[in-house]
UniProtKB/Swiss-Prot annotation:
Name used for this protein in its record: 2-C-methyl-D-erythritol 4-phosphate cytidylyltransferase
NCBIfam families given in the database record: ispD
PROSITE patterns, alphabetized: ISPD
Reactions that this protein is recorded to catalyse: 2-C-methyl-D-erythritol 4-phosphate + CTP + H(+) = 4-CDP-2-C-methyl-D-erythritol + diphosphate
Feature type site, description Transition state stabilizer: R14, K21
Amino acid sequence: MYTLIIPAAGQGKRMGAGKNKLFLLINGVPIIVHTLRAFEKDKACKRIIMAINEEERPYFEELMQKYPVEKQVQFIQGGAERQDSVYNALQYVSGVEYVLVHDGARPFVTNKMMQDVLTAAEKYGASICAVPVKDTIKKVEQGVVVETVERSQLKAVQTPQGFSVPLLLEAHRSAKQSCFLGTDDASLVERVGKKVGVVEGSYYNIKVTTPEDLLIAESFLHVQKK
């Protein structure tokens, strides 16, 4: 069993929508609702904690009225950074040994990914899902290529990411004490010297970040319904 944490206080500036991108629609339904419905199917998910911008609480509560989910969803105050939101949410976790942290803007997560991440977290204490990098990666400085990076060992990391609760708390507290800001929760665990297991993600498991992603998401949903 696990508790799901969704940091949902971000502004989504790259989307340029003027509002939280989680409220944007895919096939007439808000992105966050698609995501919640995906986890609703997972029996191992005990409850859901969403770290939100307090000003948006009425909008989230209205969504839950319009699109109810059976699992318990708790809204808590998010932080200035995604990392702060996850840390705040951890303070409300109880009764489970593991948490999964997931981007609310990844609505195409599958039950297999959830289970694989949880299993790997039980084995290693921390886990991520990832896919091989397909494009050539180059390091660029001041507009000039300085290195072509060997991509055979590179992975594009996704969510969900799974953790034992004590380990993730330790990693967050250490980062907080050192004013360290990581790019994801797994990077905080790496920082304290712990292993992070890796399981297979999916190229369908996109994070809806730009207007182009919305079009791709609509296409994915259309394919799923066929």
